[in-house]
Amino acid sequence: MKCICRLSECIGKWLKVSVMRRLFVWFVISVAALTSCGNKSNKLRDVDPRVESLLNEMTLDEKIGQMVLFTSDWDVTGPTMYEGYLEDIRNGRCGNIFNAYTTDYIRELQRVAVEESRLGIPLLFGYDVVHGHKTIFPVPLAESCSWDMELIRQSAGVAAAEAAASGLNWTFAPMVDISVDPRWGRVCEGAGEDPYLGSQIAAARVKGFQGNDLADTLSVLACVKHFAGYGAPIAGRDYNTVDMSERMFRDVYLPPYKAGVDAGALSVMTSFNEYDGVPATGNSYLLKDILKNQWKYQGFVVTDYTSINEMVHHGVVPDEAEASVLAVNAGVDMDLQGVVYFNYLKTMVESGKVSTRTIDEAVLRILNVKSRLGLFDNPYLYCDKEREQSIVGSMQNMQVAREVARKSMVLLKNDEVLPLKKGERIAVIGELASSKRDLLGSWKAAGEWDDMKSVLEALVAYNGASNVVYAEGCKKMGDDRSGFLSALLAAQSADKVVMVIGEDWDWSGEAASRTDLGVPGVQSDLLELVAATGKPVVVVLLNGRPLTIERESQVADAILEAWYPGSRGAEAVVDVLYGEYNPSGKLTMTFPRNVGQVPIYYYEKNTGRPIYLPNEKYKSKYLDSPNTPLYPFGYGLSYTTFEYSDLKLSSPGLKKGKSIVASVTVTNTGARYGEEIVQLYIRDLVGSVTRPVKMLKGFQKVALSPGESVQVSFVITEDMLSFWRKDMTFGAEPGDFHVMIGRSSDDTLQASFNLSRK
């Protein structure tokens, strides 16, 4: 070490550039670490020895600084709690920043951290890149309806490349919360109601964001959120209490988080809700027992916005000081914008309520992730102006967004009206038809709409201005009917009507819960009048959740669920309406008939009084509505038709540790090329605890020309039959099973097999 110190003095005489000084410090730390890292022991694998050595050089204030995440004044996604972040970066008391982007701005903040703080530890820069950065893709719920894992991975990869090119190295995504309640506004950010599909998508998005190498400048750190159970608030009201059985929690809600962690995610965000009476941000059962111990999670845990502070309101701690103790001892490594760790954690350590070992473990996790991102080798790795100008919002990325949007749309109804014919006179009605902003949905990141087309503009561009007449008709909100007459006149002058209706973008997302799931305002009243003209009416829905559209489905001739389709969503809508692309999307959330059916999902239990005959009275049913949804999970139409036949099993019995194969023939019986999502469901007929009527266990997407057939096969293993049993062990139970393969959760062929004890 004496030689190293003398070498430092000599080289220091000619090191004039601050960045070089910092790099040299890291060189010294690296050499020193080679002699000391073997004496350390911790639960993490593959810890950078420089990180362990650096930890020994840090003061308590500097350690706590690494556990602090403050917002910049660049963009705000919540109430600003603290504004002196620049001085705190200099003092080593803030190690992470969010809501900042562009290479110029981030380079300057990074310069302050690296060149003006004592140890020069680089900053993490996070942002809500939820469904794109500059190029905005369809909202995640829409993307999930593509059932296309490679496409979803690709869209996350494009988002990561653009974010990284803008200086960012961390996204607060993916949201993997399962939800069966469309009243909850944040369903638009997730993958729907199914744990198997949700797990596949969670893994695909993590891999898309993080790529093959976190230090690759086309990748960013993913953040699996919101851990855990955030998608199940009572009454669908955001931030509300979550109360469910441990079995339901483990069977349905936990799997996507586990899939994200297994895919390599190195940050996990806590949720606002409580679980089993304890807020998730202070819940050691979730954060330590499950995440860090059972799952061997290698990354760090960050809170959601001020959720440590909010534990005071939950009533589990008397003040924010005690909240800091509860959070850090439960396993929270980083405080997002709460200023609680910043204000109180040092005092709590000095008082003995928090151990230095707890602090060290948290800081070690954070610093190790920074190392994995390559920030210790090059703090400005993500600050390349040339890359920013060439990648962000490129034509190539926009084309990917258009492809994702086309594959995410779901054709809900079509009475031989679609596809439209070019040259027909089209009346376009609805305020949403002329809106660009609404196409982006919530969490638009750096997305802009100035260079986008509205659905109206895209229709004019494709069909010609002389063949399109527009009337707003009514606003998307409110009860003004003064434009109805002009809309009816426009409809009467046209061959067909395209009516664009749905939700304002701000009515979906965080803090956007609803008690009425109908189309807002008087849009549906206008639709009924337009349909009464006798002209064929095509409804295009722009929304972020399943809506109750039974009324609309009765009067419209065709309904296309376009969701919030993103930067090139308008062009994608036109592609589908005119048959340039044959729709193939399938619903990943059930569409209820009315809000009284909510929560509603396909994997319900049979109950002791299932319905066998429609008029039976003392059964589990409603007096005023069928139990069945309007549109079930897995449903979606095409411009062609597919026939399922010849379901076969390779064996009627499945032995433990072995597998059987289920196969079905799918034939394109229509006149167009099309893609079909073939779905596999399994039912466990008798269990030690009650089991769902079916659960999705596999799917495949096939592409067929007219008249073409293909045999689709699924391998069924014992693992696919496993669940949390009566004694809360995980595994399969011997017995009889139904296997169902088909085009949706309620339209399948069925066969049976038996799982033996041996």
Model-predicted segments: where are they?
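Extracellular and select intracellular beta-sandwich modules with Ser/Thr-enriched
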Residues: D747-A751
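Bacterial Sec-dependent N-terminal signal peptides
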Residues: M1-L44
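Glycoside hydrolase catalytic-domain context in secreted enzymes
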Residues: A33-F723, G731-S745, R757
